[in-house]
Amino acid sequence: MSIDFKGRVAIVTGAGGGLGRQHALGLAARGAKVVVNDLGGARDGSGHSLTAAESVVAEIRAAGGEAIANGASVTDWDAVQAMVQQAIDTWGRVDILVNNAGILRDKTFAKMDLADFRLVIDVHLMGAVHCTKAVWPHMVAQKYGRILMTTSSTGLYGNFGQSNYGAAKLALVGFMQTLALEGAKHDIRVNSLAPTAATRMTEGLMPEAVLAALQPQAVVPAMLVLVSEDAPTRTILCAGGGNVEAANITMTQGDWIGLDSDAPERLAAQLDQVRDRAGDMVPPNGSAQGAHEVAHATARLT
């Protein structure tokens, strides 16, 4: 099965370098028309320049593809709306959104300024919200859309000194879970990708030998599958160095602790059993937790 994007229009945010650049090049190489969005700022989000986005556009055009540059900040709702309109005015539609833009403001939580916490949330989470909100009505109208959230192992599992980044990245998974349910009837499929790649964002975070093995282009195949015609939905893929894994948010079978006054003590005594991963499940939606608990309660109380 060949994956191609002929006739499709994609927006890739944070595409002026690193992973976003590789995403834009990968989509264009397989026929997509690409809006290369990049604020052109520093790793911490400061500054602005269209040079990086224009450079990627030049690469795509030199290879025979179609692309336009856009310098909107994903934190600016009006600018994001204008970016989507730019795609519509140029090519008549928007089929794919890759939410990739991000910054880092790493410090331990004790030392972190709340402004730095909020800014990381604004760029990663609200930036994705803005872009997704702007493309959503177009995707609903055309009964087709593919949206990718860039999550992270930090969001899924935690990382020292990245409480702001981790909070934003796990929030994107929750955002994905609900949008996938809401978009299903419109053939809008929403997924998440947790990349491990050597980029400007990861400089200084890992040893050089490790970074050398984690070239950003190795993540692109996972991205292409997650925004393809036959993409899954509500899927989290982790990718790096040529390896791909799937991550799931699971729930154990749990255990009955009852309603008596000693329920806290029972839970403390049974905590290992409650946390036992044998037979754990991936709930199809948020209501499944309540349904599971009601079924157990009904069985015990009747």
Question: Where are the regions a protein language model picked out?
Answer:
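Residue(s) in the substrate-gating loop at a strand-loop-helix junction
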Residues: 152
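Substrate-binding pocket helix/loop in short-chain dehydrogenase/reductase
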Residues: 60, 108-109, 116-121
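C-terminal helical subdomain
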Residues: 192, 210-301
